[in-house]
């Protein structure tokens, strides 16, 4: 436990359990007591208090452990999904997968601290998995977007990320189905995505949460004291290992993009991954540049392309070794 505000989250969770109400004003600070507080992460703070009450605040790390296990399971399922794109061989747990997962964990470690943001990490990956898997199977599993977005909107301020993913995915699908005619309109996808967006309004603050992400973004930009919020224009940002890891991951992903583009052509690679994936890839690069802590979202979204690129490069090297060895 290394975060200075965990006590605040635990105390807020305790107050809400004892009073059977959601905090609506600042209760515990010296300078802002009584000021209105939009506590998006109220539900997660209740969960934090529940875990801490079982055996002390150290059990918050157990929550992070559960989140990490979920991440690993979803990375495995995501690997199975992206290998089905047939850009590389059939999936198996090999060197490429192990390297990609270890790189992912190393890159994410700095934000795996038992904080509510673990929800956003898990759900960002879950959204990615659901969207890519739906391109392959067209199953009704896509309706999981609805309860997941509902949970997100009551557990962490980055729920706006889910809204952006959904809006971009809807716009991209309309472009692919109505303009380019690559596929028919997917009614299940459209319905589940629209209902997931609507579910954001089910929270103690109601419809206000649809505009709250803009306020959060402005508040983050005004914060000059929290180093994790320093952006790409600061020296601090470039002094962090994760910034250079992001550059490396981006470089590898670009290699992969051009390799697969050469193999399939531009329309082909867009059809395989989906236009939404690449639009969001660019948006998450931008998001990562706005704050050091936001690089995690880029690492999550880059994982499929990183994995396939490493696998493809490995196959190419193996082929050349056999030819000249």
Model-flagged regions — what are they?
Residues 110-119:
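Short acidic/glycine- and proline-prone juxtamembrane loop motifs at membrane-interface regions
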């Amino acid at each position: 436990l290394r975060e200075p505000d965990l006590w605040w989250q635990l105390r807020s969770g305790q107050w809400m359990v004892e009073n059977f109400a959601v905090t609506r004003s600042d209760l515990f600070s010296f300078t802002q007591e009584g000021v209105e507080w939009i506590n998006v992460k109220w539900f997660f703070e209740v969960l934090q208090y529940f875990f801490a009450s079982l055996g002390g605040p150290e059990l918050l790390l157990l929550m992070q452990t559960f989140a990490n296990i979920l991440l690993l399971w979803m990375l495995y399922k995501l690997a199975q999904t992206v290998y089905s794109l047939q850009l590389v061989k059939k999936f198996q747990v090999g060197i490429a997968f192990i390297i990609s997962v270890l790189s992912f964990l190393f890159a994410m470690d700095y934000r795996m601290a038992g904080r509510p943001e673990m929800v956003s990490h898990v759900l960002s990956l879950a959204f990615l998995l659901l969207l890519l898997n739906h391109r392959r199977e067209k199953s009704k599993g896509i309706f999981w977007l609805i309860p997941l977005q509902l949970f997100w909107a009551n557990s962490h301020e980055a729920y706006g990320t889910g809204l952006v993913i959904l809006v971009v995915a809807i716009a991209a699908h309309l472009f692919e189905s109505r303009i380019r005619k690559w596929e028919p309109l997917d009614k299940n996808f459209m319905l589940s995505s629209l209902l997931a967006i609507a579910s954001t309004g089910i929270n103690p603050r109601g419809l206000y949460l649809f505009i709250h992400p803009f306020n959060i973004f402005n508040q983050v930009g005004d914060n000059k004291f929290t180093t994790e919020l320093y952006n790409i224009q600061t020296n601090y940002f470039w002094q962090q290992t994760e910034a250079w890891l992001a550059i490396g991951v981006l470089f590898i992903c670009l290699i992969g993009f051009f390799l697969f583009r050469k193999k399939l052509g531009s329309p082909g690679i867009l059809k395989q991954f989906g236009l939404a994936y690449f639009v969001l890839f660019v948006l998450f690069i931008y998001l990562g540049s706005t704050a050091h802590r936001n690089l995690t979202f880029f690492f999550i979204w880059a994982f499929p392309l990183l994995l396939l690129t490493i696998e493809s490069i490995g196959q190419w090297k193996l082929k050349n070794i056999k030819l000249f060895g």
